[in-house]
Amino acid sequence: KNWIFSFILVSSILVYFTIEKNNKEINVAILDSGVNTEHIKQNITTINFSADKHTKDSHNHGTAISNLVIQNITKANLYHLKVLDNNGESTPSNVEQAIDWCIKHNVDIVNISFGFPKYNYKISKKLDKLIENGTIVIASSGNNLGGKSDFPASKSNIISVGGLSKDFKISRYSSSGKIDIYNLSENIESINNQGKRELFSGNSFATALTTNEIIKMKQS
């Protein structure tokens, strides 16, 4: 059943977005709350753009997201750009700096498992430049209980991800509006910031799973 769902997911992505294959190592960036690298099997470079003085994941979000994004990925340079602080909060300036870094370092795929309730002009323009360079950006539509999608997932040139329950129904807390892909979002098993297995729920994790599939598509 999950294999069939993965096939449908990949087919849906191909309908709306062009994924150019690349047999070489690709650059993958995860914008989130930091990562406790000792709990991640793959090597991952961390860079801090938050107000914190470290790249550790005190919010118990970025480690789980990173683990899902990069599971079973081998030919990739992995980067975690910490833009969320220990409370899971960020500023537009933090995100702008991280996007500039992605542009400068020719990142191929960017995962954004969070969002802002309001549109931001500067972030939007920087994302446009990033995408014009060929970068694929995947973002969470938010957990807004049927409300409108968060920014930047609401942008037309970004792959916006909504959530599904285990029986493949739209999750009760999933956002509506502009959503390109739905993926599983409830009771997703990953690694927490203490290195233990934990079940997580939310469109953040549906986004991470979708990014993982897109990385595999690009490398297939």
Task: Identify what each model region corresponds to.
Residues 65-69, 102, 210-217:
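Buried hydrophobic packing segments
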Residues 26, 32, 150-219:
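Extracellular S/T/G-rich loop segment that most often corresponds to the catalytic His/Ser-adjacent loop
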Residues 19-79, 97, 167, 194:
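Active-site core segment of subtilase-fold serine proteases
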Residues 47-53, 69, 82-84, 141, ...:
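Residues at the C-termini of beta-strands that transition into short coil/loop
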Residues 10-18:
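Hydrophobic alpha-helical membrane-insertion segments, chiefly the h-region
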Residues 1-8:
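N-terminal Sec-pathway targeting helices
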Residues 84-156, 167-169, 195-207:
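Substrate-binding/access-modulating region of protease and related hydrolase catalytic domains
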Residues 27-31, 77-82, 108-113, 136-140, ...:
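Structural recognition of the beta-strand scaffold that forms the well-ordered cores
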